[in-house]
């Protein structure tokens, strides 16, 4: 492992105009600088640089779309193989989390509430704590992590890594209130009443988007985002049909295969697969089949019913064949995107959303309620961890300015 990483680091050209950083990375990770520090055996400094730019660096090293971002932008890849920065980043970042001694920053006298402890919430909690704010995180589930803990499968992201962030936050003085839903017994108005100077909302998108087709409420149907929370609680059966073509659909398919399913088929309406290329390849490698051109129109006791798409020369859907395709399946898992839950919006006066239920924010990450900021999936819809971090960093800048820090 270490030899491979050193070899990869030595392949880096140290480009002055580093496309891996400026073009490939949503959070502008200073990749050439990190690799240079690593090559000089200045591991702690490299880890510090990564962490301060992106507290979720260790997570991103495992779940990012590297081939479509940093590694996909590496100039070495034009005529050969790109530098595998993901391996280098993982080595540095996990070592940094294990070895770093964390201490609380001097108090600045401000209190911040963070609602949700997914990647955006953790990023904001850490950043604001480092500025000396007294931070309290409110998490509706027993464990922190959000999608990191309850969405991304263990085989992609070890839970032990996710829980290291609880240690980091607590060591920085962050208080965590698990199993507490804001929008339930407590509302955002209560937080503002109780002296929090700013509130950050990073509650993600945890409500499955229903398809509105007959049979969606049958007992042989699951929603992907709910299934991934606890796959062991469901008898998935031998033959599984997954509806959708995004990352959640791929995670569902791979999880089902690890849960005893013998045949897993992913059905996509179009020929455009929105999931990360690497995840699609791994899904097929694990044994799932991906079938394009199937638009689900109903579900019966035997399985899904599809219309078969007709494509033009540009692979656009231009119509459907007349005959319906009835497919046998023990379980149908719908993984066709998700939207935010509406409890928080319904209990917060003046908090505006768009037509999808996503929170509206300005260029500083502030919502339509003064002092309440938001970022991540609850603003953008379901994207990747690194995009959540990018939004969280913008919100931190906005909160810092708002608080006069």
Residue spans of the language-model regions?
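Ferredoxin-type iron-sulfur electron-transfer modules and their immediate structural context
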Residues: 1-106, 111, 159, 201-217, ...
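Feature captures the FAD/FMN-dependent oxidoreductase FAD-binding
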Residues: 106, 111-115, 163-213, 297-302, ...
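Glycine-rich Rossmann-fold phosphate-binding loop(s) that bind the pyrophosphate
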Residues: 116-119, 245-246, 377
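Rossmann-like dinucleotide-binding cores of NAD(P)H-dependent redox enzymes
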Residues: 134-137, 141-172, 176, 253-297
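A structured beta-alpha segment of the ubiquitous adenosine-cofactor-binding alpha/beta core
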Residues: 173-193, 231, 293-296, 302-330
């Amino acid at each position: 492992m270490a030899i491979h990483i050193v070899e990869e680091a030595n392949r880096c050209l140290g480009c002055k105009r580093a496309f891996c950083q400026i073009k490939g990375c949503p959070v502008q990770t200073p990749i050439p600088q990190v690799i240079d520090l690593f090559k000089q055996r200045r591991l702690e400094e490299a880890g510090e640089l990564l962490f301060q730019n992106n507290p979720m660096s260790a997570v991103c090293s495992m779940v990012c779309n590297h081939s479509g971002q940093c590694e996909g932008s590496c100039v070495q890849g034009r005529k050969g193989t790109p530098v595998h920065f993901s391996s280098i980043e993982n080595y540095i970042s996990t070592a940094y989390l294990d070895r770093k001694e964390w201490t609380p920053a001097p108090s600045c006298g401000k209190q911040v509430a963070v609602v949700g402890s997914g990647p955006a919430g953790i990023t904001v909690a850490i950043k604001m704590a480092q500025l000396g704010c007294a931070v309290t995180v409110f998490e509706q589930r027993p464990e922190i992590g959000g999608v990191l803990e309850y969405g991304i499968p263990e085989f992609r992201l070890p839970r032990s890594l996710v829980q290291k962030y609880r240690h980091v936050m607590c060591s920085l003085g962050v208080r965590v209130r698990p199993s507490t839903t804001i929008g339930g017994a407590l509302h955002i108005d209560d937080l503002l009443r109780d002296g929090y100077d700013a509130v950050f909302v990073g509650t993600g998108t945890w409500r499955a988007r229903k398809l509105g087709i007959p049979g969606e409420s049958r007992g042989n149907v699951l929603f992907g985002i709910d299934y991934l929370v606890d796959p062991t609680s469901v008898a998935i059966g031998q033959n599984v049909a997954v509806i959708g073509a995004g990352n959640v659909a791929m995670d569902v398919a791979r999880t089902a295969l690890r849960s005893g399913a013998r045949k897993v088929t992913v059905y996509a309406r179009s020929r455009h697969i929105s999931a990360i290329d690497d995840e699609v390849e791994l899904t097929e490698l694990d044994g799932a089949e991906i079938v394009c051109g199937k638009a689900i129109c109903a579900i019966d006791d035997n399985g899904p019913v599809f219309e078969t798409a007709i494509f033009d020369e540009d692979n656009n859907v231009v119509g459907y064949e007349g005959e319906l395709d009835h497919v046998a399946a023990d379980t149908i898992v719908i993984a066709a995107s998700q939207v935010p839950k509406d409890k928080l919006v319904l209990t917060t006066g003046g908090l505006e959303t768009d037509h999808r239920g996503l929170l509206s924010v300005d260029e500083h990450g502030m919502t339509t309620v003064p002092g309440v900021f938001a970022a991540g999936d609850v603003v953008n819809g379901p994207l990747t961890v690194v995009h959540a971090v990018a939004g969280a960093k913008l919100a931190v800048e906005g909160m810092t300015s708002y608080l006069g820090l």
